[in-house]
């Protein structure tokens, strides 16, 4: 009896026993390093560095952790408040800091363009004409790394909406939603062609192409008891398959889906969760990854400006 209980205890999956903090920090650091090389040292970075896509890893980890946070919340509203309030104030501060820094280097001009553009930034609308002093500063594209934030907020809202519907459904429903979210990614280019300008704008600000990356994390969270033990054993196999697929895509110029090859993305998601549960529990008191992710472009821009 005692032996059986011991075995059961070992098999019992421990959700908290993960090192996602490290992976998050690593990914944010990775994105930062890539931007620094690209913009400050102005050299072409080997495509190999695009394989490990920090954004995909961050989306996938969100998908794995956010539904858990939803479960712990008293209600949907509390969840949204907790999540969105974590992101938005710090994002606004970051945007304001970015504007102040740009103004310090290039002089501040208050006009209609600036006001519309600035309000747009605050509500995640990225495609508005930039004021000149912003375009003249740094790499000329204001905080190019913030484009993922609008999708993160959308993920939270979608989670809040469909969580109850999905919660106790059978496996086939989950598989169906997974396939549907992959299909959304695949139809994006066709929609871009047939839709009028307004529709195109909506799509470029929507998480359609990225939702499957987040949902892959959610799917693994839902079936974590079965999936995680397998993934922590097969993670090296996933890495080998991932590298093989990446080499194949590079070699033959193949890419399934928008943004990044779908097979690579899914393998990367499997790797993320596999590695996340391979090193026991590692937690940071402060989550640096978000701050790094937010602020590194301000620094990059200053360096580019000083030249």
Feature names for model-found ranges:
Residues 242-307:
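Alpha-helical transmembrane segments of multi-pass integral membrane proteins
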Residues 21, 38, 119-260, 301-307:
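Aromatic-enriched alpha-helical transmembrane segments of multi-pass intramembrane proteins
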Residues 1-16:
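Short, Lys/Arg-rich, polar N-terminal cytosolic tail immediately upstream
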Residues 5, 54-86, 90-113, 299:
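Juxtamembrane transmembrane-helix termini
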């Amino acid at each position: 009896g005692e032996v059986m209980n011991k075995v059961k205890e070992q098999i019992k999956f421990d959700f908290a026993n993960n090192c996602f903090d490290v992976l998050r920090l690593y990914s944010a650091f990775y994105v930062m390093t890539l931007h620094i090389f690209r913009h400050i040292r102005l050299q072409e970075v080997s495509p190999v560095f695009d394989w490990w896509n920090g954004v995909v890893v961050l989306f996938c980890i969100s998908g794995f952790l956010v539904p858990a946070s939803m479960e712990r919340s008293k209600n949907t509203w509390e969840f949204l408040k907790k999540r969105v309030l974590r992101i938005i104030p710090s994002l606004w501060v970051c945007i304001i800091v970015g504007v102040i820094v740009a103004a310090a280097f290039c002089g501040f001009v208050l006009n209609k363009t600036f006001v519309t553009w600035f309000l747009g930034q605050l509500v995640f609308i990225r495609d508005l004409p930039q004021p000149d002093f912003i375009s003249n500063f740094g790499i000329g594209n204001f905080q190019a790394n913030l484009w993922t934030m609008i999708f993160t907020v959308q993920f939270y809202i979608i989670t809040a909406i469909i969580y109850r519907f999905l919660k106790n459904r059978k496996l086939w429903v989950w598989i169906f939603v997974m396939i549907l979210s992959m299909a959304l990614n695949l139809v994006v280019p066709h929609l871009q062609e047939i839709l009028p300008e307004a529709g195109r704008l909506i799509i470029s600000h929507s998480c359609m192409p990225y939702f499957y990356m987040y949902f892959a994390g959610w799917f693994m969270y839902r079936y974590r008891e079965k999936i995680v033990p397998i993934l922590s054993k097969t993670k090296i196999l996933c890495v080998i398959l991932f590298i093989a697929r990446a080499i194949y895509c590079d070699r033959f110029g193949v890419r399934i889906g928008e943004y990044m090859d779908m097979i690579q993305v899914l393998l990367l998601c499997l790797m993320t969760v596999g590695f996340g549960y391979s090193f026991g529990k590692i937690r940071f008191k402060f989550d640096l990854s978000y701050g790094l992710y937010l602020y590194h472009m301000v620094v990059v821009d200053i360096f580019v400006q000083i030249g």
